[in-house]
Amino acid sequence: MLVFRQLFDPTSSTYTYLLGDGERGEAVLIDPVFEHARRDSALLRELDLELLFTLETHVHADHVTAAWLLKQRTGSRIALAAASGAQGADRYLEPGEAVSFGRRRLQVRATPGHTSGCLTYVLDDESMAFTGDALLIRGCGRTDFQQGSAERLYRSVHEQILSLPAHCLLYPGHD
């Protein structure tokens, strides 16, 4: 059984997503926010889930990630795009790879444009995709900093996100 929670940080208008395999007790957190590490840790305990990975959709300019703090608290691993150029991750992700938790997997798709290291994570049955700042509600992420490119973002959104099946629900990084 898939466990899913959408969590929100009102200060940065940022979404964090928890996905877990309820039968195996393993989970991932996508884009955790530093100020909510305690909330996220408590939720994992409440749901009896072991956090395997914190997954970053990109290197964030608008909030501090909770990945390091959650790693210290839970022993989880940090994963982000190899193309991000960031240091200190336990796993650097390439397009086409998958991140497993229990019997479930998230496929890694490169969606550069907002930054050069943006990723979208697609659930194995293509029912859900986590787009970070590549595709937002009524818009997309800025392209005027962090090696952004409007042309690359347009191609990424059309080729990697809008090409998903019609039943796929899209979950953005911001409100």
Predicted regions, residues:
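Metallo-beta-lactamase
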Residues: G25, T115-D175
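Divalent metal-coordination and catalytic microenvironments
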Residues: L19, D31, H58, L70, ...
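Conserved beta-strand hairpin/beta-sheet module of binuclear metal-dependent hydrolase folds
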Residues: M1-L49, Y121-G132, R138
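Core dinuclear metal-dependent hydrolase active-site scaffold
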Residues: Q6-L7, L18, A98-D124, M128, ...
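Hydrophobic residues in well-ordered beta-strands that form the structural core
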Residues: I30, I78-L80, F130-T131, P172
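Small/polar loops that bind or transfer phosphate-bearing groups
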Residues: L7, V28-P32, E56, R103, ...
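Active-site HxH/HxHxD metal-binding segment of metal-dependent hydrolases
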Residues: S13, R24, F34-A110, S127
